[in-house]
UniProtKB/Swiss-Prot annotation:
It is found in: Cytoplasm. Belongs to the UreD family. Its main location: cytoplasm. Required for maturation of urease via the functional incorporation of the urease nickel metallocenter. One of its GO terms (molecular function) is nickel cation binding. Signal peptide: none annotated. Keywords: Chaperone, Cytoplasm, Nickel insertion. UreD, UreF and UreG form a complex that acts as a GTP-hydrolysis-dependent molecular chaperone, activating the urease apoprotein by helping to assemble the nickel containing metallocenter of UreC. The UreE protein probably delivers the nickel. This is Urease accessory protein UreD. InterPro entries: UreD (IPR002669). One of its GO terms (cellular component) is cytoplasm.
């Protein structure tokens, strides 16, 4: 079984951005993008933070496509990056006797933060279609005194259409180093037959992770209040949600059936993290689903679907 020989060559999209603190207290950027990735018009938030939306003009990836994102945040800079829409990973191509499932799509993120930098990476969710193969790699280097906030939400299959992952597979590699020490090192590989495992996805199609590497260790009472508030923020949301300490910072996990629930919870956590740092409260990003903004700020009453892991 082979694909037709007249296929278009795979995409090799990339973004490279450097953020620097200007004399007027705002964060300026330099860099560029290669199609199909595109930088949309940035704006400066009230606290001088550079807000940069990224657009994937091709609408999605197929097997063999690659996206590379490289970020550098200089000392004192503040930046927030998000995506305009969900990232779609379509069924693989390039099938052959050697690669019967086809070729993999690849997304790579590399970020380097200097001391005193503050970088927030909160893209919209990734949707892995049936039969798609996605390899995602994230390598983050955080200098002591810098703050990194990153979130990742992935849906395995278009469940609203009754679709599961099928012959597809999702692999994720995440490493975060703070100074000379590793804060997070994770390797994840999921395929359809593993999803029902109660010790894994428990039959749920959506997983999400939010990690905050704080610039300095939090006081015990401060951390306890942050975690307590984060657990209260689960109110009204479906799925299993857990939050715990990370040295220094926190890590939050979502497993459930709703990417919206994961996004709303992570936004509420984002507000609390900003408050702990004494920074301005974040606004609901302009490129996110606008109809969810009210739910994010005003939680509905708790439902029986909410599961608090810890």
């Amino acid at each position: 079984m082979t694909d037709t020989p007249n296929q278009l060559p795979p995409w090799r999209g990339s973004v490279s951005l450097d953020f620097e603190l200007a004399a007027d207290g705002t964060t300026q950027w330099q860099g560029g993008a290669r199609s199909p990735l595109k930088l949309l018009r940035h704006f400066t938030a009230g606290d001088g933070r550079c807000v940069m939306p990224l657009l994937h003009t091709a609408g999605g990836l197929v097997g063999g496509d690659q996206l590379e994102i490289a970020l550098h945040a200089a000392a004192g800079s503040r930046s927030f990056l998000t995506s305009v829409a969900a990232q779609k990973i379509y069924g693989s191509r390039g099938r052959s006797r050697v690669q019967p499932q086809g070729r993999w799509a690849q997304i790579t993120l590399q970020a380097e933060l200097e001391a005193g930098a503050d970088l927030e990476w909160l893209p919209q969710e990734t949707v892995v279609f049936a039969g798609a193969l996605l390899e995602q790699q994230q390598q983050i280097t955080v200098a002591p005194g810098a703050s990194w906030l990153g979130a990742d939400v992935v849906r395995l299959g278009r469940t609203a259409r009754g679709e599961d992952l099928g012959a597809g597979r999702f692999c994720n590699s995440l490493s975060i180093r703070r100074g000379e020490q590793w804060s997070v090192v994770e390797r994840l590989s999921l395929e359809q037959e593993q999803l029902p495992n109660p010790h894994g996805m428990g039959g749920e199609p959506v997983l999400g992770t939010l990690i905050w590497i704080a610039p300095e260790p939090l006081e015990n009472e401060q951390l306890a209040q942050l975690l307590k508030g984060g657990r209260a923020d689960r109110e009204g949301l479906s799925g299993t949600m857990a939050i715990g300490p990370l040295e220094p910072g926190l890590i939050a996990r979502y497993r459930g059936g709703s990417s919206q629930a994961a996004r709303l919870w992570f936004f509420r956590l984002w507000r609390r993290i900003r408050a702990v740092q004494g920074l301005s409260e974040p606004s609901w990003p302009r490129t996110w689903p606008f109809q969810e903004a009210e739910l994010a700020l005003n939680p509905e009453p708790a439902t029986t679907a909410t599961t608090a892991a810890r």
